[in-house]
Amino acid sequence: MTRTKQIQGQIDRALEATRDESWIVAEANFLKALAASRGRNDWQGMIEIVEGLRVARRGIRRKALVRGTVRILDESVTETMDLSPGRYLVQPPLVGADARRLIQFSRERNIPVAVVCREPRTRAGLIPIVAIAPGTTIRDQIQPPANEAKPTVAWFKGALEAIGEAALETIDPSEEVTRRVDRIIGCLDAIPDNEPLHVKLAETCEEAAQNAV
């Protein structure tokens, strides 16, 4: 399928930003191109876009994870709050919607962050983690950090991986392929930092393209 000039322009801008390592600008343009291509059922075109998006988000993640600490956030998330690159653990009284706003505000200000949102401990002593997007809610439960006041980088990394794995488990392989594509896109909207979800989306787009032949 031939791309529209608008979609190709978005991809060109994304690729230019990628060359400049302007990862957040690249991400924004790849996302626009992905949404427009999905609207046209251009599955083959989406595969290339997803790969570009994966690279851009890897760049964002690399910059966000340079700082070797985890910042705990339990106060209001606002557009004017003090933000710097790094890892953020959003915790009560804040909720998943606050974590999503934090990601959105950081992108708007061109600040690379990685975000995990936790909920209160369960009776079993586990910590629920959550990620949300419109129409998508993903939850999992993990072991708490040894020191809840100072969660380690390793614990944070494990939490990011766990919520991504939980998202993958929500994808039913027996579901119609275009529905799976949309479900994975929703998961990526909630968890932009998970690389296996990008791989799964590309694979599912390939399946959709083959079915369309």
Label for each model-derived stretch:
Residues E51-S76, A208-V213:
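Alpha-helical linker/edge segments of TPR/alpha-solenoid repeat scaffolds
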Residues I24-R61, C187-L201:
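Short, charge-rich amphipathic alpha-helical segments embedded
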Residues I7, A14-A17, L34, I47, ...:
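Conserved small-residue packing positions in alpha-helical repeats and bundles
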